[in-house]
Design a protein with these regions (language model features):
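C-terminal motif of bacterial Sec signal peptides marking the signal peptidase cleavage site
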Residues: 6-9
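Bacterial signal peptide processing site
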Residues: 11-13
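Noncatalytic scaffold domains of N-terminal-nucleophile
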Residues: 34-74, 86-87, 91-256, 261-263, ...
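Internal maturation/activation junctions in enzymes
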Residues: 42, 328-425, 437-438, 445, ...
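Alpha-helical support elements that line or immediately flank enzyme active sites
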Residues: 79-80, 168-176, 256-263, 268, ...
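Active-site rim segments in enzyme catalytic domains, especially the processed small/beta chain
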Residues: 99-124, 280-282, 417-483, 507, ...
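Short, small/polar residue-rich loop motifs at catalytic or cofactor-binding pockets
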Residues: 292-293, 403-406, 467-469
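Extended C-terminal subregions enriched in glycine
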Residues: 415, 463-465, 497, 506-561
Length: 592
């Protein structure tokens, strides 16, 4: 199962200088480094504090777990070893990631779970956040039509918070797709134990604390109380972080299920704290939340079946759309990260992003031409417009092809069940509001709405903002599980997932090599092609020069840059189940 977190969608702040302002600590939180509980736990960083570029993958015979953090991977593995299935493990991983990767996802967020059961059942559980009923398209705008609070009102503070869906989505999965062999308590116990006993801070988490330190010592000191040390300074790699408040909250959910979170004391604490930062989330908003149960978006690519996430995520739609375009080329013969290949990828990405802006939204509020956008005939029209020169793209006309009729982890078990999940609190540390005495962070998911009141993706009460989350499962021609893949990364999510799929199918790469491979991103703005240095099959200066000669603008990113996501994937082969994890973040795959 592949769980992907939408991170890094927002800009990052400068690293902290020493502050004289102490961070307020929750009465129940323990923020003092202690001796490591387990010294032999694999670390994502080397002795110099740099992310390891190797040791991320593994081979399994009876199952595979790959997540954005080794502690979450171990939580999923523990549940599988106790006899749980891939869905049980996915639930355990989700709660565990909220403990050890709190900057990226957790109880205050939402996501999508893509499930393929060995008996043929398929479903996408959409537990995306929704806008509070009291908000509308003008919520954030001042009299001149600009976003309030210096442009921050839609992603920092109370007006950025959507109704969280994680607990409701996981409860639906537990009730309908879990093995039935394990109780909720057993599935959640690894996360509860981790919050109580502690986990070692990895490089990505430490970087996120440093990047947002200023928030933690000024307006959002409850957040700082949980994620700064006793001296109100950022943790260092290898320090052990505990969160007893979060452990207590998880225990309440383990005992009381969905109602324990959406009604009663936890819900009231959410409403009160969000209101203290100007929000309008209500008890009624929380009590009425239900996940949406959807059919996946489907397509094919060179004989493989693509099964991905439907709206309100745009991701699955555009993965199918761009692969349909690429199918018109012999990508394998064109080579890995050659100028010819990257030019085609760039033009196809621009076309898909133009369609995204024009058509994609919550289908409960807008007509989305889904059949047209995923049609091979429509993709052929895009292919026919691609020339040897870079060009600007406007939205196409997919309606003409309509018939009658949008952190990452993956888990697979011995029975052939496979799950791919993407979940998030949106930007790193969400809206920056932590719930005191309960230990979790609220999302800033409303940031994904367009601030233009005329947009198809404008803010409306009860509406889900457009997402790029793309937990994807690939099946072979006979319908057997072949691959599971997902990634965080905001708008880079679906381009990343599509590139990894192509690396496996077109270039015959192993799962880890497909993830390690250098990536690009192009959405048609002034940055042009964003490209990273480093990585496997490194993009060379000669290739960049050739792209510039074709009229492409280019923007160089860093080496192994987390801008391009943190992909986790599983590949089924005759030699075993391959698990791959992204060295751009703290991910680790473990098989059994």
């Amino acid at each position: 199962m592949a769980m992907t977190l939408s991170l890094a969608a927002c800009g990052q702040k400068e690293a902290p200088a020493a502050s004289s302002t102490p961070a307020a600590s929750s009465s129940a939180a323990t923020s003092t480094p202690v001796e490591p509980v387990e010294d032999d736990v694999w670390s994502s960083t080397d002795e110099n504090g740099n992310l390891k570029l190797t040791e991320r993958d593994d081979i399994g015979e009876n199952g595979m777990v790959t997540t954005a953090n080794v502690y979450a991977t171990m939580a999923g593995l523990e549940v599988l070893e106790q006899g749980g299935n891939a869905v049980d493990a996915a639930i355990a991983i989700s709660y565990a990631l909220g403990v050890c990767e709190p900057n990226a996802s957790g109880l205050g967020g939402g996501g999508f779970m893509n499930i393929h059961m060995a008996d043929g059942r398929e479903v996408v559980i959409d537990y995306r956040e929704v806008a509070p009923m009291a908000q509308d398209a003008y919520t954030w705008l001042d009299e001149s039509g600009e976003v309030k609070d210096n442009g921050n009102a839609n992603h920092i503070g109370g007006l950025a918070v959507g109704v969280p869906g994680t607990v409701a989505g996981l409860e639906y999965a537990l009730e309908n797709y879990a093995s039935g062999k394990l109780t909720r308590q057993q599935i959640m116990q690894p996360a509860i134990d981790m919050a109580n006993e502690g986990y070692k801070a990895g490089g990505t988490l430490v970087g996120a604390i440093n990047d947002y330190y200023d928030y933690m010592v000024t307006d959002y000191t409850t957040l700082g109380g949980y994620y700064l040390n006793a001296d109100s300074m950022p943790y260092e790699i290898g320090d052990v972080i505990t969160n007893p408040d979060l452990a207590n909250t998880l225990q309440k959910i383990a005992e009381g299920g969905k109602d324990a979170f959406y009604t009663g004391e936890i819900a009231q604490a959410i409403v009160d704290e969000v209101a203290s930062y100007g929000g309008v989330l209500s008890m009624e908003d929380l009590a009425s939340y239900e996940p949406a149960i959807r059919e996946p978006v489907k397509g094919t690519y060179r004989g493989y079946q693509i099964v991905s996430c439907p709206p309100a995520s745009s991701g699955g739609t555009h993965i199918v759309e761009i692969l349909n375009v690429l199918e018109n080329y012999d990508i394998g013969a064109m080579g890995v990260n050659t100028a010819e290949t990257l030019h085609v990828w760039s033009e196809a990405m621009k076309a898909c992003f133009a369609d995204r802006s024009a058509y994609m939204a919550d289908t409960a509020f807008a007509e989305v031409p889904l059949t047209g956008l995923t049609s091979k005939d429509y993709a052929k029209t895009i292919y026919e417009k691609i020339t040897d020169e870079s060009q600007s793209w406007n939205a196409g006309e997919p309606g003409a092809y309509e018939g009658n009729s949008t952190t990452a982890y993956s888990v697979a078990d011995a029975e052939g069940n496979i799950v791919s999940v993407t979940q998030t609190i949106e930007c790193f540390w969400g809206c920056k509001i932590a719930i005191p005495e309960y230990g979790f962070i609220m999302n800033d998911q409303l940031h994904d709405f367009d601030t233009n009141p005329e947009s198809v993706n404008c803010l409306e009460g009860g509406k889900k903002p457009l997402s790029s989350m793309s937990p994807t499962i690939v099946l072979d021609a006979e319908g057997n599980a072949f691959m599971s893949v997902g990634s965080p990364g905001g708008l880079r999510i679906w381009p990343t997932v599509a590139q990894v799929i192509s690396n496996v199918i077109d270039h015959g790469m192993r799962m880890q090599d497909a993830i390690d491979c250098a990536r690009i991103y192009e959405r048609g703005n002034a940055d042009g092609i964003c490209w990273e240095t480093g990585g496997e099959h490194e993009i060379t200066e000669d290739v960049i020069a050739a792209l510039e000669a074709q009229g492409h603008a280019v923007t160089q990113k860093g080496s192994w840059d987390l801008f391009f996501g943190g992909c986790q994937g599983i590949l089924f082969t005759d030699d075993g189940i391959q698990g791959g994890a992204d060295p751009r973040r703290d991910g680790k795959a473990i098989g059994f």
